[in-house]
A protein has these predicted regions:
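N-terminal carbohydrate-binding accessory modules
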Residues: 1-6, 10
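Active-site beta->alpha N-cap acidic-glycine motif
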Residues: 7-8, 15-146, 157, 196, ...
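Short aromatic-enriched loop/helix-cap "lid" or pocket-rim segments at secondary-structure transitions
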Residues: 22-24, 82, 120-126, 161-164, ...
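His/Asp/Glu-enriched short active-site or ligand-binding loop at hydrolase and phosphoryl-transfer sites
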Residues: 50-52, 175-177, 197-205, 210-262
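Charged, glycine/proline-rich intrinsically disordered loops and linkers
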Residues: 74, 80-91, 165-177, 218-228
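Alpha-helical scaffold elements lining the catalytic groove of polysaccharide deacetylases
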Residues: 82, 133, 139-144, 148, ...
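Structural detector of well-ordered beta-strand residues that form the stable sheet scaffold
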Residues: 109-111, 150, 232-235
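Low-complexity, Gly/Ser/Thr/Pro-rich intrinsically disordered linker/tail segments
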Residues: 261-274
Length: 274
């Protein structure tokens, strides 16, 4: 375990949040602004994996005034510029990240949904039916060096899946993943799918859908099964910076739009952690 006194805020965005041209309704605008603000204020962007390695005692880096980046759900908007219906051209998170040359260690972890059926339904019902939730971009993005791919469950237990899950599991809530059968369905199945496509141990991080972290998973299932699945840590959305005392199976993240929604609020958030 590191003897350094460290805390690292993990910031989370959703590339599908494109509700207009302004910061509060467009995570691409927010992402670009936040990168500029963080760099101007002397914060260093580091890979999310570094945060996990520090917490697990696998590394002892100087993480003073560092932050890490993540995004959830895994749309092509994470890595490719698109023409968004009604909103015009949107630069991807990767495009914006690569343009920030003042951050040599810049990196973004994209937490993706594994199930092809779930992604197809979400693309049709929640986006614009433009095949923005395919998996064709995963391997090239991972190989490029600026993107990590993380596990965001099999199907997010999303309500687009009209049929109940295992054991008549209701949809739209991840707190109900509360036994071995449901956990295997949502997490183990996703880990196996990602490993088959990206390589064993290529996706060691998990993010809880909706930020819901059931005690069963945090205190029981992940400690028993995580390592065998190649998983090292899991992230919530409860706010707060990751540090030496953080639970590795429920590491905190801040979410754009939930914990801050303007440049001034973002700057205040960083100031509170400096």
């Amino acid at each position: 375990m590191s003897t350094r006194d460290w805390q690292v805020p993990v910031l989370t965005y959703h590339a599908s949040t494109v509700g207009g041209p302004d910061y509060a309704g467009n995570d691409h605008v927010a992402f670009a602004s936040d990168l500029e603000t963080a760099t101007r204020l002397g914060w260093r962007i580091v890979p999310l994996q570094w945060v996990v390695e520090q917490r697990l005692g696998l590394a002892d880096r100087d993480l003073t005034r560092c932050l890490a980046l993540s995004c959830d759900d895994g749309t092509v908007l994470d890595v490719h510029d698109v023409d968004y219906p009604g909103q015009g051209r949107q630069p991807s998170f990767l495009t914006l990240l690569e343009a920030n040359h003042g951050q040599p260690d810049r990196h973004l972890t994209c937490f993706v949904i594994a199930s092809p059926e779930a992604r197809a339904r979400m693309d049709r019902d929640c986006l614009h039916g433009l095949d923005w939730m395919g998996e064709h971009w995963w391997a090239p993005a991972l190989a490029g060096g600026r993107i990590g791919i993380g596990n965001h469950s099999w199907d997010h237990n999303h309500p687009v899946m009209a049929e109940p899950g295992p054991g008549n599991m209701p949809r739209g809530d991840f707190h109900v993943v509360d036994d071995d059968v449901r956990a295997d369905y949502e997490i183990r199945q996703a880990a196996d799918y990602l490993a088959a496509r990206l390589g064993q141990d290529a996706c060691p991080l998990f993010a809880y859908p909706y930020g819901h972290a059931p005690d069963f998973l945090v205190r029981d299932w992940f400690p028993r099964h995580g390592a065998r699945l190649g998983l090292q840590a899991a992230f919530g959305t409860q706010g707060g910076a990751a540090g030496p005392g953080s639970d590795p199976w429920h590491l905190p993240r801040y979410v754009c739009g939930l914990h801050w929604s303007s440049p001034a609020q973002f700057e205040a958030l960083l100031a509170s952690l400096a």
